[in-house]
């Protein structure tokens, strides 16, 4: 797998959805579908899989995302949609994603900078190079082969740090 790193290709959108949509997304992600099967065998975290099978995420929300991104992803195909959840001390591991393009959305309605849990991007020498703070209603988009990980929330945070992930495949050139 060829990794890539272009700091300028990382896009951050704040206040992405209107409040009612943000609240609805968070409500959907409060359902009892979470399981402790995300990550690797030696580093488990909370995971809600199979959201690409739900019309709300795969059609309704994806159309809203595409429109807000001026159609940039309109012709992309959804490979997977899922949510990751981390509690205090559950740190992600640096990794690239499958597919061509990754969208991460942060639905938690509130977040304090002291709770940490930021998104870390790693350069081609595997050194942390860019930090994107976890912030409610923020969307982060980047090429899938960009190495990244979610830092652990601090011990001062007693909830679940949620990220909603869309894995997309680019259209084939004819």
Give, region by region, the residue ranges found by the protein language model.
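Catalytic core of non-heme Fe(II) oxygenases with the double-stranded beta-helix
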Residues: 59, 63-174
């Amino acid at each position: 797998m060829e990794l890539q790193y272009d700091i300028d290709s990382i896009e951050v959108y704040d206040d992405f959805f209107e409040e009612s949509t943000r609240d609805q997304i968070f409500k959907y992600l409060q359902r009892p579908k979470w399981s402790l099967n995300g990550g690797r065998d030696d580093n488990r975290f909370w995971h809600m899989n199979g959201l690409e099978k739900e019309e709300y995420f795969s059609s309704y929300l994806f159309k809203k995302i595409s429109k807000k991104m001026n159609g940039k992803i309109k012709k992309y195909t959804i490979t997977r949609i899922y949510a990751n959840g981390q509690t205090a001390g559950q740190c992600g591991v640096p990794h690239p994603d499958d597919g061509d393009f990754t969208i991460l959305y942060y639905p938690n309605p509130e977040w304090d900078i002291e709770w940490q849990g930021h998104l870390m991007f790693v350069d081609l020498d595997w050194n942390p190079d860019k930090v994107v703070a976890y912030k409610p209603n923020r969307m982060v988009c980047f090429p899938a082969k960009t190495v990244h990980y979610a830092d652990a929330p601090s011990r001062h945070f007693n909830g679940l740090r949620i990220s909603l992930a869309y894995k997309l495949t680019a259209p084939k050139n004819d």
